[in-house]
Curated annotation (Swiss-Prot):
Cofactor(s) required, per the database record: heme b
Keyword set, alphabetical order: Chloroplast, Electron transport, Heme, Iron, Membrane, Metal-binding, Photosynthesis, Photosystem II, Plastid, Thylakoid, Transmembrane, Transmembrane helix, Transport
Binding site for heme: 23
Function: This b-type cytochrome is tightly associated with the reaction center of photosystem II (PSII). PSII is a light-driven water:plastoquinone oxidoreductase that uses light energy to abstract electrons from H(2)O, generating O(2) and a proton gradient subsequently used for ATP formation. It consists of a core antenna complex that captures photons, and an electron transfer chain that converts photonic excitation into a charge separation.
GO cellular component, one term: photosystem II reaction center
Cell compartments where the protein resides: Plastid, Chloroplast thylakoid membrane
Domain of life: Eukaryota
Protein name: Cytochrome b559 subunit alpha
Disulfide bonds: none
Length: 81
């Protein structure tokens, strides 16, 4: 049951001027936006991940790994102190 779906072939799309006019702006802006998102530290606040300087503290020099899934909240409290 071969047939046409009515869509444009991919080769027609990527060889069109309209495609490159649109994507010459959107692709670089995604990279710049991502770079700003990470370099300003907003990504750490939004996703709740520790900043690179917060992985190890003066009192704790090992990796903060959860070893007991039933007492995970207690272990997290110990890591954040």
């Amino acid at each position: 049951m071969a047939g046409s779906t009515g869509e444009r072939p991919f080769s027609d799309i990527i060889t069109s001027i309209r495609y490159w006019v649109i994507h010459s702006v959107t692709i670089p802006s995604l990279f710049v936006g991502g770079w700003i998102f990470v370099s300003t530290g907003i990504v750490y606040d939004i996703f709740g991940t520790p900043r690179p300087s917060e992985y190890f503290t003066e009192t704790r020099q090992q990796a903060p790994l959860i070893s007991d899934r039933f007492n995970a909240l207690e272990q997290m409290d110990q890591f954040t102190k």
